[in-house]
Amino acid sequence: MIRTMVYHRKKIWVVFLICIMLLLGLVGRLWYLMNVRAEYYSKKAEDLHERERDIKAARGKILDIRGNILADNRTVCTVSVIHSQIKDPEKVIRVLSGALSVKEEEIRKKVEKISSIERIQTNVEKSIGDRIREYDLEGVKVDEDYRRYYPYGSLASKVLGFTGGDNQGIIGLEVKYDEILKGEPGKILTVTDARGVEIDGTGERRKEPVSGNTLRTSLDVNIQEYVQQAAGKVMEEKQAERVSILLMNPQNGEIYACVNVPEFDLNDPFTLNTEETAAEGEKKQDLLNRMWRNPCLNDTYEPGSTFKIITMAAGLEEGVVSTEDRFFCPGYKVVEDRRIHCAKRTGHGAQSFVEGAQNSCNPVFIEVGLRLGSDRYYKYFKQFGLLKKTGIDLQGEAGTIMHNPKNMGEVELATVSFGQSFQITPIQLATTVSGIINGGNRITPHFGISVESADGTKVRTLEYPVESGIVSGETSRTVRTILETVVSEGSGKNAGIQGFSIGGKTATSQTLPRGSGRYISSFLGFAPAEDPKVLALCIIYTPQGMYYGGIIAAPVVRSIFENVLPYLGIKRTVTETPSGENRADGVD
């Protein structure tokens, strides 16, 4: 009996000690939470009773080289409702439905939805947002927001790009420089009770947004507008599929204008600019993607005779041809078992290398290519930078489509030498020729010039790589001299302007499949010929009627230069120039 009582007493003591230990543990834990972790749990408690709303940052502007605003912001509003704070739901539904022109049923679904905050509509005009505020509706929040606005509409649309509903860049410079432009959003913090209702008198805490930086570009509104008008005019006159024109500084790669007509309205980028406006679903998205493409860098094409500039430079640099070399053109050249024709089927007869360039004679350049051989030609293809992308500051640049060197026989070499059987982008051609005529420096084409703060203070200057020595200074001078005679005496006469020395090269190439009757007409020109400050490349896709580049593309560049050269401060230095009469006999 006594033993049993002692045994139970021990059990009681054990239980008592366990309870004491648990109590001490709880007290210790409580002390730890109230002292050591007090700040942490205080913050957690605040978070439970704070509602957070974003304040969007103003996106940075995009400027042209002279400070004209190409992309800006308009103040709009975002209208939201907080279910727990609404005291008169019917009034809220009625007012919002009328002000926002939205059916009451749609508003009701969102008003009656139990959630911390429900967005009713974004991109609401500020005047409408202000009108809703005047009703002072409990549970309705009207926050200011920003919507991207493009003052010049369709100008440089495929360069600038546009933003989506979240104000983030989708294409063009808007997406390339998104990190620079987007800024940092702010916050609005309000205190609520356990039901989620804001507590009167507590006010709100704000973390102000930081506006995005401004991007200054090399584009010039005046040049871009004129070039876009010239492109639209020739597209209409020749009933062409599309027209692309590049205008850049061959010395440093700054792009003055980049036009691809038809362009699209940047303020309404999801509306098609074609006749298929009723397209829906995947078909519409495909058409939109095509509308947004920038053919100057997203698409490749056979450059045709403008590529003879590259063959010319390689041949002169390697020493396999000189300006005094003589050639004979019977209207074709036989390579292996293939007869490859000249543009002039009756032939140019005896001519010098310079005259061959003036006449854009295929057999002459085939001969230069064969003298080089596939290994050396491929070496220069690589040396000139044609096997790598230009590095332009836009997304989606396409690469060169070229023969594998192991499969490059004499026939392939012959056709490549005058710009066929491979494909490059227009920006690649313009960049490569720039490097050849500027003294041998492979520059990087670009639009971005500098980053500035919202108040206009320069943050940094954007820099781009330059690769020197792709050709010698002597070769560069010789190429410029030859190409000046192409305009003053040869197939590029229609680009000549009284008083200006202009160099250039015409081109006319067939689209695939051969024999389809579809052509690409182009002209590449630069001025002044002795010290180039501006280079232009005009490409007309599928023109109707006369399709020679020297007849339809060269005059476009002439009209652009007539306005742009004086605008850029380039003076007339030549006393005599070609008459500019049309040359249709065997020209490219």
Residue ranges and their predicted role:
Residues 71, 193-204, 245, 250-306, ...:
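Beta-lactam-recognizing serine transpeptidase/beta-lactamase-like catalytic domain environment
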Residues 1-276, 300, 375-387, 396, ...:
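Periplasmic/cell-envelope proteins involved in peptidoglycan metabolism and beta-lactam response
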